[in-house]
């Protein structure tokens, strides 16, 4: 996703108040990092003082984590890094020219490693047999809101279940059946159970066209996150501040899914997705203040 920043993000506070103000539409960028419920970042503070450290896999010198091996460096014990369990699987398709060290896709893999897979384009999975359970989170002329995508997901699921549901090598056999005749006049409380996987594109915006136009992604419903403003510190000129970094897009989608689809109160379950992001933001923001740039 794009590399964008907000000019007025405030510093994050550990273990602070709930995330209620995220949905009131006011001062969104001001509230993001100060309202997170994060695990202790003491391990990152210690690592910062030590400086760069070796990757345990490739021996490269890195700060905090290795962005090519997707593991913490030796100075950051892996058991002190939070693990976030996501309700959906995530595929991240990264542009080959995307600078690994500038990408936030690695944050998702580090913090939710069981639920996140990163592919480097042109390596793209086949999704044609999974259209009824996959959405592409990407803004565009055909993108819809998360709520509106319910109609597409349900419709595709109905058509899939009406046909012979034979197992294939690419997709496990159908485990859920949806009998529309039995549900006429009955409101579906959780119709998004069809949704199993999200696709995110990790790229600067001027490089996304090649990936988004790939035939393997055609026919997938696109979902756009509305009214969210980025706090990413790498501003890409000419794009609106609603164009989010990859980790921000994943984070916001999970909150929307949790509150809109699962209809549960959000209590910070996914805040640790911004564990590295918020800490790095604070470092960069402090450096800008010291240099008189803020």
From Swiss-Prot:
Ranges spanned by the short sequence motif DXTW, renumbered to the chain: 202-205
UniProt cross-references to SMART domains, sorted A to Z: DTW
InterPro entries found in the cross-reference section: DTW (IPR005636), tRNA_Mod/Golgi_Maint (IPR051521)
Compartments, as annotated in UniProt: Nucleus
Pfam families xrefs: DTW
Lineage top rank: taxon: Eukaryota
One GO cellular component term noted in the UniProt record for this chain: nucleus
Name of the protein: tRNA-uridine aminocarboxypropyltransferase 1
Protein species of origin: Xenopus tropicalis
Gene name, Swiss-Prot/TrEMBL: dtwd1
